[in-house]
Swiss-Prot record:
SUPFAM superfamilies: Actin-like ATPase domain. Pfam families: DUF1464 (PF07318). The lineage of its organism: Archaea, Methanobacteriati, Methanobacteriota, Methanomada group, Methanopyri. This is UPF0285 protein MK0078. Belongs to the UPF0285 family. It comes from Methanopyrus kandleri (strain AV19 / DSM 6324 / JCM 9639 / NBRC 100938). HAMAP family: UPF0285 (MF_01087).
Amino acid sequence: MTRMYVGIDHGTSGIKVAAYDGEGDPEFLGKAPRRKVAERGLLRSLPDEARRAVEEAECICLNYGMGDALTEFTPLEEAEDLGVGYGLRDTSGAGREFGAGRRMVEELSELGVEAYLAPGIHRDLPRLDGAFRVFSHVASGEKLGTARLALELSSSKDIVVCDTSSNTVSVVVKDGEVIGGIDACLGAPGVLQGPLDLEAIRRIDAGELSANGAFSTGGIVKIVNCAGEDPESAVEEFIQRCGKEEKEWLARLVAWEVAGLGVVYDCDEAWIGGTLSGDDEFMGVLERVLSKAFNKVAGLPPESASMGLALIAADIASGARSVLGVRISRRP
């Protein structure tokens, strides 16, 4: 029987599942809307092939929430023992919550498959560069998946990996280890979510909206009329309905973030993942600008996070002690 390693990306636009059999490249198997998972559960919401992969997996690596309570890849049952939330002490963070993640975690626990939670990238990670410790949080755990896939494909161990979709998050990899990055609420916006500007701060202080509400609508949607604010459809609307000009605006902002990190940390290559990596107009602008700062600019599949998490699941099953400089917590 073929061994199957599964990655599950609990993202803004849905829960994505990929699998890796130890040969070739990981394969994206399907996606389930978060609202549907919250109502029906993960397995009943996935396409058949993805459901079977989850049920038959030798090892699963997944992300859930911000991941700030974890500093290692942690067995699911150990993370749950930490309490309420992710890690599982705290699910609170940025973005809209539907309850799908908690339902997913509970279901996987009952399934009995070996499953590991990916930690977030935050100031308590031992390998984090000191400059990034000024920020409490740099990225949630699925970005480790995106970085793992990029390293698998890259000819360099010094790269910037950017995931741009509902939001934009960039991660710096030096000597094959994640040392920092820029979170969605700090740097370039995505389609739906983005940093808090002066207008947002004033509205928050005036009690007109919450900080999370400001972040959740801080992306390029606030200045364009071609995409709405539904987290499960905003990105596809942007790709299908917005023109070259709007895509160029966003691409310039993403390029600003990625190029800055690349110059400061002397990185050779830039790898772009997330749903927008599949849009030719957006990527054309990004590649043209970033080629001035990097020896190579390449796109990753839109499902790169789940695919990379599947590779990490295989690393864990093979007995690796760490991935990307992040330790793996082993059962006694």
